[in-house]
Amino acid sequence: MASPVEASPGCASGLGPHRRKRTTFSVGQLLELERVFAARPYPDISTREHLAQITHLPEAKIQVWFQNRRAKRIKDRKPGALNARLELPPNCSLPDTPQLSWDPGTPSHPLHSTSSAQQTSACPPQTSCLAPILGPGQSWSGAKAAAPWGTSEVSGVHSLEQIVPQTSLGNLSDLIYTSAIVTNVDHS
């Protein structure tokens, strides 16, 4: 069976069925949407309206984006589902837990990292995870007290709980994803 676009040769002249234009989000819009999604995947109307003002998107599009993002998260967590974020080049591996030296003057930047596993040049830099490793049953609420960046306001964010949901991170993709969010918030 042909798709509606293929089945309607009159589509180019405006006679065929109308197809809704796909929304393209800018990098800034996506970063803001992902940041809020990490804190609250089910935002209330006031949060969505605030996002609409910040991103210059209609509230309805923001609501649909959150619905789609929740569906994607559920799909990614199904057993046996391939997760594109975890696909690494064959000659690349995640490093062991790095030992970091922190400069108290600049709490968000490590001075250096020593790890027993060195990355190869083909490894993308985002594969090294500098977030604390949490065991089963641990949550970010317990880890935030030991976080080197503290729990005071960072770039308008009031606490780590607003960046990262308080759930157990037994899934490696969640850990990598959360680390990227914390890193992005830290550098913004």
Swiss-Prot record:
The record's listing under SMART domains reads: HOX (SM00389)
Q: Which domain of life is it from?
A: Eukaryota
> Where is the protein situated, by its record's location annotation?
Nucleus
Which terms in the Gene Ontology molecular function aspect does this entry carry?
Answer: DNA binding
Map out region (Disordered) in residue numbers. 80-125
Pfam families documented for this protein: Homeodomain
Cellular component terms (Gene Ontology): nucleus
The answer to keyword Nucleus applying to this record is: yes
Q: Name one GO biological process term.
A: embryo development ending in birth or egg hatching
Q: Enumerate the UniProt keywords alphabetically.
A: Developmental protein, Differentiation, DNA-binding, Homeobox, Nucleus, Transcription, Transcription regulation
Q: Spans of biased composition, class Polar residues?
A: 111-125
Chain residues forming the annotated DNA-binding region? 18-77
Q: What role does it play?
A: Probable transcription factor involved in the control of specification of mesoderm and endoderm.
Q: Which family does it belong to?
A: Belongs to the paired homeobox family.
Protein name, entry field? Homeobox protein SEBOX
Organism of origin: Rattus norvegicus (Rat)
UniProt gene name = Sebox
